[in-house]
Amino acid sequence: MYRYKITFAYDGTNFSGFQIQPNKRTVEQTLKNAVNKIAKHPTPAIPVIGSGRTDAGVHALNQVAHFDIPYHLSNESMRKALNSILPLDILIKKAELVDNDFHARYSAHRKTYRYRVDQGEFVNPFKRNYTSHFKYPLNLEKMRKAADDLVGTHDFTSFVASGSQAKSNVRTIENITIKRDEVRNEVVFDFTGNGFLYNQVRIMVAFLLEIGSNQRPVDDVSRVLKAKDRTLARMTAPASGLYLVNVDYGTNDEKD
């Protein structure tokens, strides 16, 4: 068997998330269908293993998955073959033959997510599926100061949605940047960490927006982290503004 790592982008608007669900259009099922078509529909079907799940409406710029296939194709042939089958809202950017010990989920070292907030007076119909909307003035310095308290290793119980299957809510956030995109009239958040809990990024964004709009004090992060109480960070930002930007494996896994 030959193991391939694929790096791909998708528009999450018309997907019910990444993970396979009965009678739902998902990214995982769509990829699985394409891979099994290339492999001439073996039994049992070939699974596609992603680096992690994204929810309905969440996008990806560089999601990663792997699969094992009984036929050898060059990297470029595999990329082109998949793209010839896949719908237009998924694009395979790179296909790589890798060692069999590579695992899209367990080999990952860190991930980066981006969240885009449109600051227009009204919702832009052409951006509504790709940003969230917050028209009120935001103090970026206050949000940056608060974000510093999220960086590091913490128990993020207050920032995880119900339904999480994680065994531990301890995660490490390495970096958070908050910038204003003057051209697009957006505020852009980037979060890099060793992994993120269910809805964690969207909850943190909503929390920081409350601080930036003076609905919370700047030092509220520490209090809420220590409390380990989800009701203290009650809001969740919409899925439409969230993007998986990068999955870092720390090494070059591609085989010659």
From Swiss-Prot:
Positions annotated as active site in the UniProt record: D55 (nucleophile)
Gene Ontology molecular function: any one: tRNA pseudouridine(38-40) synthase activity
Transmembrane intervals: none
Residues where substrate binds: Y113
Gene3D superfamilies on file: Pseudouridine synthase I, catalytic domain, C-terminal subdomain, Pseudouridine synthase I, catalytic domain, N-terminal subdomain
Example GO BP: tRNA pseudouridine synthesis
Catalytic activity of the protein: uridine(38/39/40) in tRNA = pseudouridine(38/39/40) in tRNA
The EC number(s) this enzyme carries: 5.4.99.12
Coiled-coil zones: none
Record key words, sorted: Isomerase, tRNA processing
Keyword Protein transport carried by entry: no
Pfam family, one: PseudoU_synth_1
Similarity comment: family membership: Belongs to the tRNA pseudouridine synthase TruA family.
Quaternary structure note: Homodimer.
PANTHER family, per database record: PSEUDOURIDYLATE SYNTHASE, TRNA PSEUDOURIDINE SYNTHASE-LIKE 1
Role this protein plays: Formation of pseudouridine at positions 38, 39 and 40 in the anticodon stem and loop of transfer RNAs.
Protein name: tRNA pseudouridine synthase A
UniProt source species: Limosilactobacillus reuteri (strain DSM 20016) (Lactobacillus reuteri)
Classification of source organism: Bacteria, Bacillati, Bacillota, Bacilli, Lactobacillales
